[in-house]
Amino acid sequence: GVDSTVSAILLKQQGFDVIGVMLKLWAEEGFNRENQCCSIEAANQAHRIATKIDIPFYLLDAVEPFYKAVVQPFISSYLSGETPNPCAWCNPLVRWKQLLLYADAMNADYVATGHYVRTIKDAEGFVHLFRGMDSQKDQSYVISRLSQDQLQRSIFPVGDYFKSQVRKISAEYHLPYSE
């Protein structure tokens, strides 16, 4: 989406070598609703935008780890009368795990996402998580379960921006979702 794309743009401006990676989390053939995070159209759009901003793009298959770590526990929790939050499980157990494995394979030092959070490393090297600058878009809750090792290797470029600023940067690059 716009937040991930602008994160890539900001990192390129800072001199990072950037690649685009999207996780395929769902295998159901009929799951192709427009503007859904895992749809074929979303993957195609991500590839087109990566090409437009001149970064390589990779689609990683994470269907099995997602099903085991998120879907099965979600179903069990729901059937037990709980109200599960799949994002809280997905980020540390699937998204970051898979992205960091791929980063290691690509000899990449960091993983960056378009989440609206901020981090600060203290003098002892401990990474502290803070709310994003835009309180309306803050996503610290869904990032809060990341391990210290995962946070050490994570960058959140849009955490210091308001959504309106992110959309303005997107518009400067004539991206399709800048409104």
Report each predicted region and the residues it spans.
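His/Asp/Glu-rich metal-coordinating catalytic cores
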Residues: 147-150
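Catalytic core of tubulin tyrosine ligase-like
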Residues: 167, 176-179
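ATP-dependent adenylation/nucleotidyltransferase module used to activate substrates
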Residues: 2-145, 155, 164-166
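Rossmann-like dinucleotide/flavin-binding elements
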Residues: 170
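Active-site and glycan-interaction determinants of carbohydrate-active enzymes
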Residues: 173
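Short gly/Ser/Thr-rich phosphate-binding loop of adenylate-forming enzymes
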Residues: 161
